[in-house]
Amino acid sequence: MTLSLIIKWGGQEFPLSALSEEDTVLDLKHSLKSLTGVLPERMKLLGLKYKGKPAENDVKLGVLRLKPNTKIMMMGTREESLEEMMAPPPDNDEVVNDFDIDEEVVEVENREENLAKISRRVKDYKVEVLNPPREGKKLLVLDVDYTLFDHRSCAETGQELMRPYLHEFLSSAYEDYDIVIWSATSMKWIEAKMKELGVTTNANYKITFMLDSAAMITVHTPRRGLVDVKPLGVIWGKYGEFYSKNNTIMFDDIGRNFLMNPQNGLKIRPFMKAHLNRDKDKELVKLSQYLKEIAQLDDLSELNHKHWERYLAKKQGQ
């Protein structure tokens, strides 16, 4: 009996009707190779289950009891595309290689269900704009806990737990960047904390808007399982006329938060034990200098922020 299937890959649909129930999963993959150029060993077919597990290559399609025109999502990259992605452009040692960050990033970043979740956030999440985006400015997205202040230590006031040089850092950044606060907590908590730290009332800079945990999405990764992330695509989808991957940088002390946008994320050292480290922490001073250096660039997505200190030392040594 002939099977009719629809394979979804790369934003396209590929109808298949030349396979029979006696053909195997591997036969299906070889048919897809001729259509897409993706090698069978590079493919993942989502939704093909046998006895509760992903169907192995030798499983016959007939035992999977596929309904006519069943839609199957395929993941995989053409060999030439992989070579292109993995080969760093010449004469630029600051260009990021996604595979250095994490091999699963490529899969997570482009997975269709994750992009669909972002689209829903773009459509449904309500942003309260505190100050309108400014033409020609880049975008700086900042985490709160352990990035701007130590939220675990005890103190009489929030000022005691504030990261050193916070207001100087934000004042300097505001010259070149619109500033967005994004915390994995509730908006009520974010507003209270920003007010307590004097961030939303400072005359030297303005916050464009703030995002809470409701703007985040959950993604599945092979290595980490389910994780919550902060997809910058939510901001780009809502304010695409101002912000994109080319002019956005995000600071967070948790690297997985920018799993969907690794090329835009900078993992900041966490600020903890404020009473012990208040006089020693100079992270925001150095990062202020880094932001000033890269503000001159047309495309921030080509930088590897993992090596920001090396980049800064190199620039300052010139």
Curated annotation (Swiss-Prot):
One of its GO terms (molecular function) is metal ion binding. Its cofactor is Mg(2+). It is found in: Nucleus. It catalyses: O-phospho-L-seryl-[protein] + H2O = L-seryl-[protein] + phosphate; O-phospho-L-threonyl-[protein] + H2O = L-threonyl-[protein] + phosphate. Residues 3-81 form the Ubiquitin-like domain. GO terms for cellular component: nucleus. Its EC number is 3.1.3.16. SMART domains: CPDc (SM00577), UBQ (SM00213). Mg(2+) binds at residues 143, 145, 253. Keywords: Hydrolase, Magnesium, Metal-binding, Nucleus, Protein phosphatase. Transmembrane segments: none annotated. GO terms for biological process: regulation of proteasome assembly. Residues 133-294 form the FCP1 homology domain. Dephosphorylates 26S nuclear proteasomes, thereby decreasing their proteolytic activity. Recruited to the 19S regulatory particle of the 26S proteasome where it dephosphorylates 19S component psmc2 which impairs psmc2 ATPase activity and disrupts 26S proteasome assembly. Has also been reported to stimulate the proteolytic activity of the 26S proteasome. The Ubiquitin-like domain mediates interaction with proteasomes. This is Ubiquitin-like domain-containing CTD phosphatase 1. It comes from Xenopus laevis (African clawed frog).
